[in-house]
């Protein structure tokens, strides 16, 4: 009989990923798997059994091809003529946190469960982050 995970039985770990010199798409896939909990043997699709993920050095990630110049992100407020676009390079320089959240959100379920999963993603520009207490507990075991 297959074991299903229950909410009160889940123990969440804190995983720190260094984005320096990693390919963006492969890193985002790894983050999505950790947030969903698909790396665990008791993965249950209707329960949030994923870990907390802390990404450091977010703006030092690599992109393949000409994506930095060619890829664009669009925003629209709802008013006529208010469509604005930013290139991937601009997004990476100004708001790398938003870039990671947009990419990971596309790989998670579009439900309340997906919203709960994306809240466990913490992204920081450099290698300093305020979650050293949570991550050091895992290293002490």
UniProtKB/Swiss-Prot annotation:
Biological-process GO terms, alphabetical: negative regulation of translation; translation
UniProt keywords, alphabetically: Ribonucleoprotein, Ribosomal protein
Entry keyword annotation includes Ribonucleoprotein: yes
InterPro entries: Ribosomal_uL13 (IPR005822), Ribosomal_uL13_bac-type (IPR005823), Ribosomal_uL13_CS (IPR023563), Ribosomal_uL13_sf (IPR036899)
GO MF term list: mRNA binding; structural constituent of ribosome
Gene3D superfamilies: Ribosomal protein L13
A single GO cellular-component term on record: cytosolic large ribosomal subunit
Stored SUPFAM superfamilies: Ribosomal protein L13
Keyword Ribonucleoprotein: yes
Signal peptide: none
Xref: Pfam families: Ribosomal_L13 (PF00572)
Family listed: Belongs to the universal ribosomal protein uL13 family.
Summary of the function given for this chain in its UniProt record: This protein is one of the early assembly proteins of the 50S ribosomal subunit, although it is not seen to bind rRNA by itself. It is important during the early stages of 50S assembly.
Assembly mode: Part of the 50S ribosomal subunit.
Protein name (record): Large ribosomal subunit protein uL13
Organism: Helicobacter pylori (strain Shi470)
Lineage of the species this protein comes from: Bacteria, Pseudomonadati, Campylobacterota, Epsilonproteobacteria, Campylobacterales
């Amino acid at each position: 009989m297959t074991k299903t995970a229950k909410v009160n039985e889940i123990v969440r770990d804190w995983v720190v990923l260094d984005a320096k010199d990693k390919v963006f798409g492969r890193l985002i896939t790894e983050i999505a798997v950790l947030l969903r909990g698909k790396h665990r043997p008791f993965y249950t699709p209707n329960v949030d059994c994923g870990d907390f993920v802390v990404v450091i050095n977010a703006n030092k990630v690599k992109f393949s091809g000409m994506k930095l110049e060619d890829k664009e992100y669009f925003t629209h407020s709802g008013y006529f003529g208010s469509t604005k676009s930013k290139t991937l390079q601009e997004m990476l320089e100004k708001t790398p946190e938003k870039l990671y959240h947009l990419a990971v959100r596309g790989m998670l379920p579009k439900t309340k469960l997906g919203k709960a999963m994306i809240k466990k993603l913490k992204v920081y520009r450099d290698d300093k982050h305020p979650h050293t207490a949570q991550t050091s507990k895992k290293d002490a075991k």
